[in-house]
C-alpha cells in the first residue's frame, strides 16, 4: 500500500505506545505534526525552545514507563536540543529523537537547514539513522527504540527527509514492535561481594541510578538497615 512517511512514522510511534512528543513544528516536520495532531493516542507538546523539549522528554523517560520522544527540525532544532540529549546520554536515559531532514530527492546544495547533523549528534547518541525510503521508516523507528532501551539506555537519533514525509510511497504492514527483555539478575558472587563491601565500610552510602527506579522498597530497606545516606542521579 502507499502511505506518506508522516503517516507511517506516527503509526509506528503509536505501536510503540508513545503518548507524548515534544518539540516545535517547522518547514521540515509540518507533515509529522499534522499526523500527530490527528492521532487519538499521541499528544504533541509544543515548546518555545528545543532545549526545553529535550529535558521534558528526558523527564518523561525517568519518571514513567514511557519513552521520551522529540520531534524537531534539522540544524537549529538539533543544536538547540543538544543539551538535553547530551544529559540523557550521560545519564543513560532512553530517548527517541525524530528529526525532519532536507529533501533527499533534489540535487541541490545549501538547502534551508542543511547541516551535517549526524556528525554533530553522533557523539551524543547511541546511534543515528538516516531514513532513505518509505519502507524503512517503521523498522528504523522500532530499531531506534530497541537500541535506546537495550544495554545501557540512551538517546537514538532518526532523520526522516521531508519529501518522504510529504509524498506517498510503498510501505508494508506496520510490523509488531520489539519487546525488550528485562535485565537478568546479577551473578550471586557479585551481589555477595557488594554486600561484603557495604558491611565492611565504616561510613556506607548508597548512590542510586535510574536503573533502580523499580526497586524503591528494596533500596529503602538496605538504607535503613545500614543507616546509610542515599543520593540519586535523578
Regions found by a protein language model. Give the residues of each.
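N-terminal alpha/beta PP-like core and its mobile active-site loop of ThDP/TPP-dependent enzymes
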Residues: 1-234
Amino acid at each position: 500500500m502507499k502511505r506518506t512517511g508522516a503517516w507511517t512514522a506516527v503509526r509506528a510511534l503509536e505501536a510503540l505506545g508513545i503518548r507524548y512528543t515534544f518539540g516545535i513544528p517547522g518547514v521540515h516536520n509540518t507533515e509529522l505534526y499534522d499526523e500527530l495532531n490527528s492521532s487519538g493516542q499521541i499528544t504533541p507538546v509544543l515548546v518555545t525552545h528545543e532545549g526545553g523539549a529535550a529535558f521534558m522528554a528526558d523527564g518523561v523517560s525517568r519518571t514513567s514507563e514511557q519513552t521520551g520522544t522529540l520531534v524537531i527540525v534539522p540544524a537549529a532544532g538539533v543544536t538547540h536540543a543538544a543539551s538535553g540529549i547530551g544529559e540523557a546520554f550521560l545519564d543513560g536515559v532512553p530517548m527517541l529523537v525524530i528529526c525532519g531532514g532536507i529533501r533527499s530527492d533534489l540535487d541541490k546544495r545549501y538547502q534551508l537547514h542543511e547541516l551535517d547533523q549526524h556528525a554533530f549528534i553522533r557523539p551524543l547518541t547511541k546511534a543515528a539513522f538516516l531514513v532513505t525510503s518509505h519502507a524503512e521508516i517503521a523498522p528504523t523507528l522500532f530499531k531506534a527504540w530497541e537500541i535506546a532501551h537495550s544495554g545501557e539506555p540512551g538517546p537514538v537519533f532518526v532523520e526522516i527527509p521531508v519529501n518522504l514525509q510529504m509524498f506517498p510511497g510503498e510501505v508494508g504492514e506496520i510490523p509488531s514492535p520489539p519487546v525488550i527483555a528485562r535485565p537478568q539478575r546479577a551473578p550471586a558472587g557479585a551481589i555477595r561481594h557488594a554486600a561484603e563491601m557495604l558491611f565492611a565500610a565504616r561510613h556506607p552510602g548508597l548512590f542510586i541510578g535510574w536503573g533502580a527506579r523499580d526497586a524503591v522498597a528494596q533500596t529503602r530497606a538496605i538504607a535503613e538497615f545500614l543507616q546509610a545516606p542515599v543520593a540519586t542521579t535523578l
